[in-house]
Amino acid sequence: MSQYKTGLLLIHPAVTTTPELVENTKAQAASKKVKFVDQFLINKLNDGSITLENAKYETVHYLTPEAQTDIKFPKKLISVLADSLKPNGSLIGLSDIYKVDALINGFEIINEPDYCWIKMDSSKLNQTVSIPLKKKKTNNTKLQSGSKLPTFKKASSSTSNLPSFKKADHSRQPIVKETDSFKPPSFKMATEPKVYRVVDDLIEDSDDDDFSSDSSKAQYFDQVDTSDDSIEEEELIDEDGSGKSMITMITCGKSKTKKKKACKDCTCGMKEQEGKEINDIRSQQDKVVKFTEDELTEIDFTIDGKKVGGCGSCSLGDAFRCSGCPYLGLPAFKPGQPINLDSISDDL
């Protein structure tokens, strides 16, 4: 049993619906000589209801149905899993989405043969490395081939052929006195540029036409003789219709009467008269309709001599009667036959 590696199996809550996936994972781990000594749900570890021991497991396997590119794992648990692993322990089940968090928590990412994270040994990371310092070589130091290093001499002042420069003589420069009058250059004011206007020929032609039409109208009114006598309004009225009123009132087609409608603020009593007429019409419409004996015989088929009813099918039975027929439920009978309870006692 000691040859098996101790492992921890973390399960996503969605995997609980497929227990065969858990069994297959355990079988694959057993083939690699890994035995899961503990098995927890990831949400239990996330909410703190379960705590892990430090440096207890050699392998931690996270089982989830999510794709590698869609894995959602609490980042705070990466450090918890790192503490629970032994040095050189492996974490399986996460992807490169949390690559930065893995490097921060001391994991080394392995891509081959299987993708996993390996916890690096902290003792090796904290070891100090001594770096030997090289001694300064002298001029007599020889190279590995046996030849000496090249030497360089400092150039002397006598052997240097650098160019020489002389300071300029300020005495030869022109001196400007304050008494000398300085005349600034004169400038002439530029003349305004000429502006040339380009006019379309079509616009000029239209303007000429408008001007000619206006002038022709003015000439026409000048030629009109204003001395002519104006036409009087009375001359426009015919002699036959001069004595008759031109305004007519529309008469009713039925009553042949001419009646004016009452004004909105009527004070002559016409509005009250119209209201009375309207009330009379409404009262006639509200009267209860009463049937005479002759009218009742047309709808009551039980009277002698009346062979049919209102719909003509009441005597045939319920299958032929209307929904509001008063004889619903009674057996079929002959038209004109009196109905009593003795005749239907067998059906009751």
Swiss-Prot record:
Pfam family for this entry, one: DRE2_N
GO CC annotation: mitochondrial intermembrane space
Keywords: 2Fe-2S, 4Fe-4S, Cytoplasm, Iron, Iron-sulfur, Metal-binding, Mitochondrion, Phosphoprotein
Region of interest (Linker), ranges: 163-242
UniProt motif Cx2C motif 1: location: 311-314
Residues at which [4Fe-4S] cluster binds: C311, C314, C322, C325
Chain location of the short sequence motif Cx2C motif 2 per the record: 322-325
Chain intervals for the UniProt region annotation (Disordered): 137-170
Positions of the UniProt region annotated as N-terminal SAM-like domain: 1-162
The protein's required cofactors: [2Fe-2S] cluster; [4Fe-4S] cluster
GO MF term (any one): electron transfer activity
InterPro entries attached to this UniProt entry: Anamorsin, CIAPIN1, Dre2_N
Main location group: cytoplasm
Fe-S binding site B: region residues: 311-325
Phosphoserine: modified positions: S206
Lineage top rank: taxon: Eukaryota
Composition-biased stretches (Polar residues): 144-163
One biological process term in Gene Ontology: iron-sulfur cluster assembly
Subcellular location: Cytoplasm; Mitochondrion intermembrane space
Residues where [2Fe-2S] cluster binds: C252, C263, C266, C268
Signal peptide range: none
Annotated family: Belongs to the anamorsin family.
Function: Component of the cytosolic iron-sulfur (Fe-S) protein assembly (CIA) machinery required for the maturation of extramitochondrial Fe-S proteins. Part of an electron transfer chain functioning in an early step of cytosolic Fe-S biogenesis, facilitating the de novo assembly of a [4Fe-4S] cluster on the scaffold complex CFD1-NBP35. Electrons are transferred to DRE2 from NADPH via the FAD- and FMN-containing protein TAH18.
Annotated domain remarks: The C-terminal domain binds 2 Fe-S clusters but is otherwise mostly in an intrinsically disordered conformation. The N-terminal domain has structural similarity with S-adenosyl-L-methionine-dependent methyltransferases, but does not bind S-adenosyl-L-methionine. It is required for correct assembly of the 2 Fe-S clusters.
Quaternary assembly: Monomer. Interacts with TAH18. Interacts with MIA40.
Stated name of the protein: Fe-S cluster assembly protein DRE2
Source organism of this protein record: Saccharomyces cerevisiae (strain YJM789)
Gene: DRE2
